Amino acid sequence: MTRSVWKGPFVDGYLLKKADAALASGRKDVIKTWSRRSTIMPQFVGLVFGVHNGQKHVPVSVSEDMVGMKFGEFAPTRNFPGHAADKKAKRK
């Protein structure tokens, strides 16, 4: 179920403050965040966020196409190594 339109997009307040400070100073440092639930806003375009995936901060460079999506969509939390190879077929 999607979020109600009248509520507007959710963004953690500290994330907006950090992004505004980065834009004002012109610095291109990675902004670390644990807020995977926050929506990517238009003023975040061009900034680099370090989105936490449970182990480390994955660098996410925000582009125009990402606006409206969540930060968590760009930092996968699970690593699928693939299915185990068939040992019988490998021996031949």
UniProtKB/Swiss-Prot annotation:
Keywords: Ribonucleoprotein, Ribosomal protein, RNA-binding, rRNA-binding. One of its GO terms (cellular component) is small ribosomal subunit. One of its GO terms (molecular function) is structural constituent of ribosome. Pfam families: Ribosomal_S19 (PF00203). One of its GO terms (biological process) is ribosomal small subunit assembly. It comes from the Bacteria. InterPro entries: Ribosomal_uS19, Ribosomal_uS19_bac-type, Ribosomal_uS19_CS, Ribosomal_uS19_SF. Protein S19 forms a complex with S13 that binds strongly to the 16S ribosomal RNA. Belongs to the universal ribosomal protein uS19 family. This is Small ribosomal subunit protein uS19. It comes from Caulobacter sp. (strain K31). The lineage of its organism: Bacteria, Pseudomonadati, Pseudomonadota, Alphaproteobacteria, Caulobacterales. The gene is rpsS.
